[in-house]
């Protein structure tokens, strides 16, 4: 029904954010709403999906079309509902999920809340070969950039100044870690030295 909303983020809460569009506040459930902290009171475009249930109409918001497409694909898997799909997207990128599905990595999928071996197998069975992945080198760079950006936001939340963060950002870009935690640990060591 709604493809996207373009407006100002007014409120960020643990499960959702409120985006004001033409004087109306839309409550949008999003994966990890706190990643929008740096955009509070700023104009953004939020790609949306309306889910109508018997007892509620819920609006889900995503940073891009790729994330929205992954949400919709996961939501169609037997045993996965919108809540589980959001939980998966809150801690992983669509590219990482596709890579796990294509490599049949059940161990990667069962780390998400509410996903057991049976559901992980169902995700692989339903989605393998049906999702597209970008070029490997592009994928790796994109994943690294996402992880690094989340680490930089963590430094901001820890109270480091923009100037301090900019100093270590160039060095961190040279690293190729696979998790945000690794970037944060390395960055904290750089701040100390």
Curated annotation (Swiss-Prot):
Chain intervals for the UniProt region annotation (Domain I): 1-63
SMART domains: HhH1 (SM00278)
Region described as Flexible linker: 141-142
Keyword DNA-binding: yes
One GO cellular component term: Holliday junction helicase complex
Molecular-function annotations in GO: ATP binding; four-way junction DNA binding; four-way junction helicase activity
Localisation: Cytoplasm
Pfam families (UniProt xref): HHH_5, RuvA_C, RuvA_N
Region Domain II, residue ranges: 64-141
Gene3D superfamilies in UniProt: 5' to 3' exonuclease, C-terminal subdomain, Nucleic acid-binding proteins
Superkingdom, natural source: Bacteria
GO biological process, one term: DNA recombination
Keywords, ordered alphabetically: Cytoplasm, DNA damage, DNA recombination, DNA repair, DNA-binding
Main subcellular location of this protein, as a coarse class: cytoplasm
Region annotated Domain III, chain positions: 143-193
NCBIfam families: ruvA
Record note on quaternary structure: Homotetramer. Forms an RuvA(8)-RuvB(12)-Holliday junction (HJ) complex. HJ DNA is sandwiched between 2 RuvA tetramers; dsDNA enters through RuvA and exits via RuvB. An RuvB hexamer assembles on each DNA strand where it exits the tetramer. Each RuvB hexamer is contacted by two RuvA subunits (via domain III) on 2 adjacent RuvB subunits; this complex drives branch migration. In the full resolvosome a probable DNA-RuvA(4)-RuvB(12)-RuvC(2) complex forms which resolves the HJ.
The record's note on its domains: Has three domains with a flexible linker between the domains II and III and assumes an 'L' shape. Domain III is highly mobile and contacts RuvB.
Family membership noted in the UniProt record: Belongs to the RuvA family.
Known function: The RuvA-RuvB-RuvC complex processes Holliday junction (HJ) DNA during genetic recombination and DNA repair, while the RuvA-RuvB complex plays an important role in the rescue of blocked DNA replication forks via replication fork reversal (RFR). RuvA specifically binds to HJ cruciform DNA, conferring on it an open structure. The RuvB hexamer acts as an ATP-dependent pump, pulling dsDNA into and through the RuvAB complex. HJ branch migration allows RuvC to scan DNA until it finds its consensus sequence, where it cleaves and resolves the cruciform DNA.
Protein name: Holliday junction branch migration complex subunit RuvA
Organism encoding this protein: Macrococcus caseolyticus (strain JCSC5402)
Gene that specifies this protein: ruvA
């Amino acid at each position: 029904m709604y493809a996207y909303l373009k407006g100002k983020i007014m409120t960020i809460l643990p499960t959702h954010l409120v985006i004001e569009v033409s004087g109306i506040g839309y409550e949008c459930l999003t994966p990890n709403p706190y990643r929008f902290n740096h955009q509070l009171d700023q104009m953004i475009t939020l790609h949306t999906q309306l889910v109508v249930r018997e007892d509620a109409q819920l609006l889900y918001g995503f940073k891009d079309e790729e994330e929205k497409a992954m949400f919709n694909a996961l939501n169609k898997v037997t045993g996965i509902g919108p809540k589980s799909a959001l939980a998966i997207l809150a801690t992983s990128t669509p590219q990482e999920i596709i890579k796990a599905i294509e490599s049949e990595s059940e161990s990667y999928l069962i780390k998400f809340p509410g996903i057991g071996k049976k559901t992980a197998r169902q995700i692989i069975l339903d989605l393998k070969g049906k999702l597209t992945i970008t070029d490997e080198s592009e994928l790796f760079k994109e994943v690294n950039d996402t992880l690094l950006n989340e680490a930089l936001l963590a430094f901001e939340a820890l109270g480091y100044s923009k100037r301090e963060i900019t100093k270590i950002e160039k060095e961190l870009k040279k690293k190729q870690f696979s998790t945000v935690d690794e970037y944060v640990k390395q960055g904290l060591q750089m701040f100390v030295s």
